[in-house]
């Protein structure tokens, strides 16, 4: 009994940045991990060598989403959690077909988690009261909106709403919550002027890094009561 292997945690978009940090966090805790990735970064090889199951996935179509779900269903009899981290970021730019922008944002942020939650539901159930989790990664703009990323904001708002609907559907076996970050970490190519402008948007004036997200994920996974809630990680930006 004491040597029973823990059920894996599924992380979509686990090949870089926050998804990668979460994958390593769980690996270091001897927690099995399944990671989806779109592009094969060198970091994927490191995860594989550390024992993670890494599955290349194309979430740009529903068929691609379901093909990934089938691979997960073949590989495990249960899941400890699903962390919906896969994301894309498109602006309404001159010349960009608006219908395509909206369709792309809805596909990755709405269709993908919606289909995966349904397809993998049976892997989350049957493990006890509040024993499994779904965490959706939304965005600070859900509250505020965005004049330059309207489709992106709308798709993340839909994902935020799905958090409450799936919480109602899956309780009490599965807790469903969302995390709504603003600036967490910079890209390597961000220049000093941009970084300062971005930092000034929050009261805390810092980019906290992946650990802030990891700590919140750990809290949600260990809670036996919290469900159907969105947790902002915005450094007080809503008060600016």
UniProtKB/Swiss-Prot annotation:
Disulfide bonds: none annotated. GO terms for molecular function: dihydrofolate reductase activity. One of its GO terms (biological process) is one-carbon metabolic process. The keyword DNA-binding does not apply. The keyword NADP applies. Keywords: NADP, One-carbon metabolism, Oxidoreductase. The active site is at 152 (proton acceptor). It holds the Pfam family adh_short_C2. It catalyses: (6S)-5,6,7,8-tetrahydrofolate + NADP(+) = 7,8-dihydrofolate + NADPH + H(+); 7,8-dihydromonapterin + NADPH + H(+) = 5,6,7,8-tetrahydromonapterin + NADP(+). It is an enzyme of class 1 (oxidoreductase). Its EC number is 1.5.1.50, 1.5.1.3. Belongs to the short-chain dehydrogenases/reductases (SDR) family. FolM subfamily. Catalyzes the reduction of dihydromonapterin to tetrahydromonapterin. Also has lower activity with dihydrofolate. This is Dihydromonapterin reductase. It comes from Escherichia coli O139:H28 (strain E24377A / ETEC).
């Amino acid at each position: 009994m004491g040597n029973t292997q823990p059920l894996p945690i599924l992380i979509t978009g686990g090949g870089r940045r926050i998804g990668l940090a979460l994958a390593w966090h769980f690996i270091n805790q001897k927690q099995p991990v399944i990671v989806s990735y779109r592009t094969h970064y060198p970091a994927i090889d490191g995860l594989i060598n550390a024992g993670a199951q890494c599955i290349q996935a194309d979430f740009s179509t529903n068929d691609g989403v379901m093909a990934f779900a089938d691979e997960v269903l073949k590989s495990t009899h249960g899941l400890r959690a699903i962390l919906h981290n896969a994301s894309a970021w498109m602006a309404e730019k001159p010349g960009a077909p608006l219908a395509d922008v909206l369709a792309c944002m809805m596909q990755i942020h709405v269709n993908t988690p919606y289909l995966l939650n349904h397809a993998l539901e049976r892997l989350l159930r049957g493990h006890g009261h509040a024993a499994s989790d779904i965490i959706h990664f939304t965005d600070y703009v859900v509250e505020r909106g965005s004049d330059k990323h309207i489709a992106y904001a709308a798709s993340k708002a839909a994902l935020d709403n799905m958090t409450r609907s799936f919480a109602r559907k899956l309780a009490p076996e599965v807790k469903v919550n969302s995390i709504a970050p603003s600036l967490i970490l910079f890209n390597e190519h961000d220049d000093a002027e941009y970084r300062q402008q971005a930092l000034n948007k929050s009261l805390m004036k810092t980019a906290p890094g992946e650990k802030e997200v990891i700590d919140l994920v750990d809290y949600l996974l260990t809670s036996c009561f919290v469900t159907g809630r969105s947790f902002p990680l915005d450094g007080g930006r809503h008060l600016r």
